[in-house]
Curated annotation (Swiss-Prot):
PROSITE patterns: TYR_PHOSPHATASE_1, TYR_PHOSPHATASE_2, TYR_PHOSPHATASE_DUAL
Induction trigger: Expressed in the late phase of the viral replicative cycle.
Protein name: Probable dual specificity protein phosphatase H1 homolog
Xref: Pfam families: DSPc
Consequence when changing residue 110 to S: Complete loss of activity
EC number: 3.1.3.-, 3.1.3.48
Length: 178
């Protein structure tokens, strides 16, 4: 997408009223090999037809899927205002980049597929953004696009703030003072 289209898209979405959040009902393909979903999507992953190699489980519940070759990586995160996600961003974004590079389909999920998984997906996409696009604009574009498709995305204000601080404010400070 060119800059003009991106700016227009973000401005139109940002100036309209956001619809009330609703629980997403189906898994979403975020990139060629990275998917966003919920707990039910994870349990149904072996029969999804996608051929998942990995599941990144961000719930506090550790589980296995019987008769499946999918590797489940458990990063137990709590969906509240006190959880510090920033210490997980680098590991998760590197892992997802490696899956993308090796063409390994991976499902990122939490219980509802909204906050914890939404934050990790947003961090991953922000880590891969083009240097030509301002970080704040890209953040808004992703946020509105995914929220529009899924009905709810990254609703936890603390998680949004942590992503904004790491990928927008800190990046801006580096450009100004680095």
């Amino acid at each position: 997408m060119d800059k003009k289209s991106l700016y227009e898209n973000v401005l139109l979405k940002s100036t309209g009223a956001l619809p009330k959040a609703r629980v997403p009902t189906k898994m979403m393909r975020v990139t060629d090999y990275v998917y966003l979903g919920n707990y039910n999507d994870a349990k149904a992953a072996p029969t999804s037809g996608i051929g998942f190699k990995y599941i990144l489980n961000l719930t506090t519940e550790k589980y296995t899927i019987k008769n499946s070759s999918i590797t489940i990586i458990h990063m137990p995160l709590v969906d509240d205002e006190y959880t510090d996600l920033t210490k997980y961003f680098d590991y998760a974004t590197t892992f997802l980049s490696n899956c993308e590079d090796k063409h390994y389909p991976v499902l990122v999920h939490c219980m509802a597929g909204v906050n914890r998984s939404g934050a990790i997906i947003m961090a991953y996409l922000m880590s891969r953004k083009s240097k030509d696009i301002p970080a704040f604009m890209y953040f808004l574009y992703i946020y509105h696009s995914i929220r529009e498709q899924r009905g709810a995305f990254l609703e936890n204000p603390s998680f949004r703030r942590q992503i904004i601080e790491k990928y927008i404010i800190n990046e801006h400070k580096l450009k100004l003072f680095g």
